[in-house]
Curated annotation (Swiss-Prot):
<keyword id="KW-1000">Mitochondrion outer membrane</keyword>
<dbReference type="GO" id="GO:0005741">
    <property type="term" value="C:mitochondrial outer membrane"/>
</dbReference>
<comment type="similarity">
    <text>Belongs to the CTL (choline transporter-like) family.</text>
</comment>
<feature type="modified residue" description="Phosphothreonine">
    <location>
        <position position="12"/>
    </location>
</feature>
<feature type="topological domain" description="Cytoplasmic">
    <location>
        <begin position="479"/>
        <end position="503"/>
    </location>
</feature>
<feature type="topological domain" description="Cytoplasmic">
    <location>
        <begin position="253"/>
        <end position="255"/>
    </location>
</feature>
<keyword id="KW-1133">Transmembrane helix</keyword>
<feature type="topological domain" description="Extracellular">
    <location>
        <begin position="620"/>
        <end position="637"/>
    </location>
</feature>
<dbReference type="Pfam" id="PF04515">
    <property type="entry name" value="Choline_transpo"/>
</dbReference>
<dbReference type="GO" id="GO:0015220">
    <property type="term" value="F:choline transmembrane transporter activity"/>
</dbReference>
<feature type="transmembrane region" description="Helical">
    <location>
        <begin position="638"/>
        <end position="658"/>
    </location>
</feature>
<feature type="transmembrane region" description="Helical">
    <location>
        <begin position="456"/>
        <end position="478"/>
    </location>
</feature>
<comment type="function">
    <text>Choline/H+ antiporter, mainly in mitochodria. Also acts as a low-affinity ethanolamine/H+ antiporter, regulating the supply of extracellular ethanolamine (Etn) for the CDP-Etn pathway, redistribute intracellular Etn and balance the CDP-Cho and CDP-Etn arms of the Kennedy pathway.</text>
</comment>
<feature type="transmembrane region" description="Helical">
    <location>
        <begin position="256"/>
        <end position="276"/>
    </location>
</feature>
<feature type="transmembrane region" description="Helical">
    <location>
        <begin position="32"/>
        <end position="52"/>
    </location>
</feature>
<feature type="glycosylation site" description="N-linked (GlcNAc...) asparagine">
    <location>
        <position position="186"/>
    </location>
</feature>
<keyword id="KW-1003">Cell membrane</keyword>
Amino acid sequence: MEDQRKYGAYGTPQKYDPTFKGPIYNRGCTDVLCCVLLFLAIVGYVAVGLIAWTHGDPRKVIYPTDSRGEFCGQKGTKNANKPFLFYFNIVKCASPLVLLEFQCPTPQICVEKCPNRYLTLLNAWNTPEFEYYKQFCVPDFQKNKKGVAQVLRDGQCPAVLIPSKPLAQRCFPDIHAHKGVIMVGNATTYEDGHGSRKNITELVEGAKQANGILEARQLAMRIFEDYTVSWYWIVIGLVIAMVLSLLFIILLRFLAGIMVWVMIVLVILVLGYGIFHCYMEYARLRGEAGSDISVLDLGFQTDFRVYLHLRQTWLAFMIILSILEVIIILLLIFLRKRILIAIALIKEASRAVGYVMCSLLYPLVTFFLLCLCIAYWASTAVFLSTSNEAVYKILGDSSCPHQGQTCHPETFFNSTEAHACPNARCQFAFYGGESGYHRALLGLQIFNAFMFFWLANFVLALGQVTLAGAFASYYWALRKPDDMPAFPLFAAFGRALRYHTGSLAFGSLILAIVQIIRVILEYLDQRLKAAENKFAKFLMTCLKCCFWCLEKFIKFLNRNAYIMIAIYGTNFCTSARNAFFLLMRNIIRVAVLDKVTDFLFLLGKLLIVGSVGILAFFFFTHRIRIVQDTAPPLNYYWVPILTVIVGSYLIAHGFFSVYGMCVDTLFLCFLEDLERNNGSSERPYFMSSTLKKLLNKTNKKPVES
């Protein structure tokens, strides 16, 4: 009755099918609608990229441009002798829009040199100093009969000049510290040109935002220099990581059992030592003044070291560690058989990888496709961000019929609008644009990010289905490897693309939706950081936590659904349901296997990354005497070391992702094998002899007539 209730809640066990011999070859296309939707989305994505490439100019990220979009210092232009960019009001560069649009929302002009003195327009007006001041006004500026107020309203001159220095062709305030006080030039405050004085810190904030991307550029140049002299040794380090990853996978085949049990024993010993240490501290504090005060009486203390002088603290630690120790020992006693099954599956996965060795190279295909996705997303994002244009508006008195309309400063004075409104002016308003394309820029950026998530998840899903199909053909071969197809990996790849593109698109679409929601929540969280609404912060934290958990669950469900797709060729929803029910019918085995394999793979990654990282550290810091003179001189020795560490992790992760997919595939096949077959001559088990021995299962020999 208990089994019936369990199977009723989570479906019924797989029934015996005499025609089933592994991955089904006669299958049809699944989730065709999602396949069409993916195709249309890709067409739209390409169109967005083409439009962005037409309007955008990535040179705006690197080279300075004035408010009219003209590059400073470019040969053959009127700004050829004006290499530096000057901001009218650099304080406005502290706006968050700078990061999104790569532009400060203030008029900008190209100048021959940066200002070297404090000077306001009001003080310079009608004095000889105005000749110096005029070079920082808009090109071809003439006083005529305008007053200071009108010039400032028209945005033709800055209100104030501040001592500045050029940095990456931009003029930034000459900020320095004197006896701990931030100064620009020789002052700590400045006149804003409107009769009031402001603190230097406002300039600092503006300069920080505008200067951030420039400092990153200089850093990038030094890093590039380091790569040019150390790339050879970085490649050698990555090759060592690849060799170590292969050796670890080979060792798992023979030493998986020993490694698992050694780790379990070490965990028990560490917890045991923790209990002993807590008891010794508890006994040592006996009789000491103040050690018997309870935690509740002491209350909350910001210095947590105070609690270590209380006996109650060590007693609590000892109780917690003792409970953990007892739980682990009880789990080992009652789950020892399932741990042995997990070890046997890991060994079996090593054999499967050995028979399908080309599977270890498949992560290179995934890596290449992901690089294409990242490159297209990044380039499109940059082109979209640099699509904004300087927008000018007509500003005049209330009687002007053209008030607020868009204008062009080059032609405004000869236009009908200027004749209709003699007192009007064409003034810089903002960076953006008023076309439908410019109004849709934010939406296009979100679509760009969403498509990146969708395509990246699709590439990962394609790899998982391909590997699952190859390893499933190994498990369901009764005589291994004789009954396996000639090229299992290529056959699985072809089936995945030919029949299941729609299913892969469906699964990756669900995951992409959750991921883009998480990105939007992160953006909103950043916007709410300055707010004091505690309820909003609490709600945002809960939402972020929920969607993080949802993403993890969907990834787990998708992974197992792709295995079922690779084996049976069913659509995504059917495969996800069948995989979920199969796992829930064997939930304890799933939990044990998942944790054992995760722990083993984590150990392997740490071992490989740690070994190669330590070797790289000693080499690039000239601490290995044998090759001390061989190591190249560097600006930042952490650049090649960090590259080797990250690269080693990616290589190890690539190898272990193949191994992990193999274990998961064999595990699902193993569970189905137990439900489908009974070991008779008509329904023999497909599992290895080691697994059959652990489960006390045997295949009965056919009765000879």
